[in-house]
């Protein structure tokens, strides 16, 4: 049975006469406190916050004056007291509440200013277990939730970014705050404590290796409201969750227009693919369109890798995203800007490269400070009607797999290098995925088809188109290798690769018809390798 409500109407304007300030992040605190004091608001505070306010020459009461109880246990207990929570939770127009406040000498608090111990930052810093636990705030969330619940009478400010709007509202309403304004502050406060608790519960699950906890929460902070989502009739916002994995969420944008929803989605896909390639071994470039690769290549330089990647599908590359695995240099930048590109993302960029990109004022340039580790664990989340699908990140890397040659002919060393390259790329292509590759570059990519053989045929067709556009007399797939993200259920997919001129195949294996597919490969002198790992991507 639910708790019954008394349905006491909330006042519109509530005068702010007393404020309790208890913050860890003291950004803007003194100016805000000074403005409140100038408006005649009595300041009450705790610990380090009270000290900072007093040192600024402002009159402030320590919270212990309200509670009659000192701060104890290394500051763990400061505000967990009826005199504080009664002051925040009391319904002023409820006669019983008002009588209790008078009886116990509880002085009402009209404004709470509170932000929390930096749990998320301490967790990301690699601190030990005890330090992380010590940075779980208890009193702060308790006060925030109390104030937010009682927004009928109390305003709660959790973000220093809101100080100016609070002062403006107080000035506009002659020392009061409106109910609508208090509701908005309360909504933000509950979102903040929910996000905070989500981070804590997520850390515990990770620390205790609980793969699928009974209850799971996901939190994030809004960084921007976008013009629209995937389509103009859809609204969109970008939230970051504090994960420091190098990528679009952690990048610095050096120049260019605001990123769109589709830009962010495609840029994430591009950089995750670039992260598959060790920069100490080779330069690598990935060109992405609609979250699918349209060209990927390795080279001795970013310039050479970009040229090879672009040659795979120059038509689709128009308006695409370019991701690189090394510092963007001037030579590569000069070539990239010749084709209309939406975003370039790189671990870093030289000043010369940045200047070249700056000539294209709308082209976004992002630098991340590093590459995403393809082997690191993580979580992916997809919303479905009424729920969430949660799974571990696909962190299988072909170099770590036990590859099995299943045909009479084994791949040559050059073929094996290309097979591994192609399988890396196939991991990032929407299923059904087929990737043709030669000499460390994709030459044909088939993505997103319901039939694997159709993906194979499309990849071969695109390779033929690219060859014709380049004035070549034979298809790019001649002498190539082919990777499939999942097994060939029948020999037809492999035979399509044979028809395109492929000489070797890499695929997970595991079909009931593996023997037929292997026999077809042997019949045509094709070398085939099984990985034992599938890379479906939807």
From Swiss-Prot:
Give every MGS-like domain span.
Answer: 8-158
What reactions does this protein catalyze? (6R)-10-formyltetrahydrofolate + 5-amino-1-(5-phospho-beta-D-ribosyl)imidazole-4-carboxamide = 5-formamido-1-(5-phospho-D-ribosyl)imidazole-4-carboxamide + (6S)-5,6,7,8-tetrahydrofolate; IMP + H2O = 5-formamido-1-(5-phospho-D-ribosyl)imidazole-4-carboxamide
Key word Lyase present: no
Q: What is known of its domains?
A: The IMP cyclohydrolase activity resides in the N-terminal region.
Q: Which domain of life is it from?
A: Bacteria
Specify the signal sequence span. none
Record family assignment: Belongs to the PurH family.
PANTHER family xref list: BIFUNCTIONAL PURINE BIOSYNTHESIS PROTEIN ATIC, BIFUNCTIONAL PURINE BIOSYNTHESIS PROTEIN PURH
Q: Which SUPFAM superfamilies match?
A: Cytidine deaminase-like, Methylglyoxal synthase-like
Q: Which GO biological process categories is it annotated with?
A: 'de novo' IMP biosynthetic process
Task: Please give the coiled-coil regions recorded for this protein.
Answer: none
Give, as in the UniProt entry, the pathway in which the protein acts.
Purine metabolism; IMP biosynthesis via de novo pathway; 5-formamido-1-(5-phospho-D-ribosyl)imidazole-4-carboxamide from 5-amino-1-(5-phospho-D-ribosyl)imidazole-4-carboxamide (10-formyl THF route): step 1/1; Purine metabolism; IMP biosynthesis via de novo pathway; IMP from 5-formamido-1-(5-phospho-D-ribosyl)imidazole-4-carboxamide: step 1/1
Q: Which protein are we looking at?
A: Bifunctional purine biosynthesis protein PurH
């Amino acid at each position: 049975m639910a708790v019954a409500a008394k349905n006491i109407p909330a006042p519109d304007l509530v005068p702010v006469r007393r404020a309790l300030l208890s913050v860890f992040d003291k950004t803007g605190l003194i100016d805000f406190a000074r403005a409140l004091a100038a408006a005649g608001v009595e300041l009450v505070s705790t610990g380090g916050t009270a000290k900072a306010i007093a040192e600024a020459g402002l009159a402030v009461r320590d919270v212990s004056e309200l509670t009659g109880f000192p701060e104890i246990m290394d500051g763990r207990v400061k505000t967990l007291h009826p005199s504080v929570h009664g002051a925040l939770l009391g319904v002023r127009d409820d006669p019983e509440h008002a009588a209790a406040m008078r009886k116990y000498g509880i002085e009402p608090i009209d404004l709470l200013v509170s932000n929390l111990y930096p749990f998320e930052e301490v967790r990301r810093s690699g601190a030990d277990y005890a330090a992380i636990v010590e940075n779980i705030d208890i009193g702060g969330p308790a006060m925030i939730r109390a104030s937010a619940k009682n927004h009928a009478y109390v305003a709660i400010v959790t973000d220093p970014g809101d100080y100016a709007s609070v002062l403006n509202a107080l000035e506009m309403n002659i020392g009061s705050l409106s109910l609508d304004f208090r509701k908005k502050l309360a909504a933000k406060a509950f979102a903040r404590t929910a996000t905070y608790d989500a981070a804590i519960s997520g850390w515990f699950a990770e620390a205790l290796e609980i793969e699928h906890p009974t209850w799971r929460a996901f939190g994030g902070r809004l960084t921007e409201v976008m013009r629209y989502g995937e389509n103009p009739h859809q609204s969109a916002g970008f939230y970051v969750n504090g994960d420091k994995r190098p990528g679009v969420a952690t990048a610095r944008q050096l120049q260019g227009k605001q990123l769109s929803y589709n830009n962010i989605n495609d840029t994430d896909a591009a950089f995750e693919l670039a992260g598959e390639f060790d920069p100490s071994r080779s330069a690598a470039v990935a060109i992405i369109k609609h979250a699918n690769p349209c060209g990927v290549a390795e080279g001795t330089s970013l310039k050479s890798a970009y040229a090879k990647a672009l040659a795979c599908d120059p038509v689709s590359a128009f308006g695409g995203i370019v991701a690189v695995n090394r510092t963007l240099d001037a030579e590569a930048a000069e070539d990239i800007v010749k084709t209309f590109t939406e975003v370039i993302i790189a671990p870093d960029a030289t000043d010369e490269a940045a200047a070249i990109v700056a000539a294209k004022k709308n082209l976004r340039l992002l630098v991340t400070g590093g590459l995403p580790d393809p082997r690191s664990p993580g979580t992916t989340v997809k919303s479905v009607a009424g729920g969430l699908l949660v799974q571990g990140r696909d962190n299988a890397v072909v170099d770590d797999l036990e590859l099995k040659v299943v045909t009479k002919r084994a791949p040559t060393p050059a073929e094996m290098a290309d097979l591994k390259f192609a399988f890396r790329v196939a991991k990032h292509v929407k299923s059904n995925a087929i990737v043709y590759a030669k000499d460390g570059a994709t030459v044909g990519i088939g993505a997103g088809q319901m039939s694997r053989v159709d993906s194979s045929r499309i990849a071969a067709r695109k390779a033929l188109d690219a060859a014709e556009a380049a004035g070549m007399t034979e298809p790019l797939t001649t002498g190539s290798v082919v990777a499939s993200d999942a097994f060939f259920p029948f020999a037809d997919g492999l035979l399509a690769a044979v028809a395109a001129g492929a000489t070797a195949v890499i695929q997970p294996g595991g079909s009931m018809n593996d023997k037929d597919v292997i026999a077809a490969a042997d019949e045509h002198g094709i070398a085939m390798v099984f990985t034992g790992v599938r890379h479906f991507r939807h």
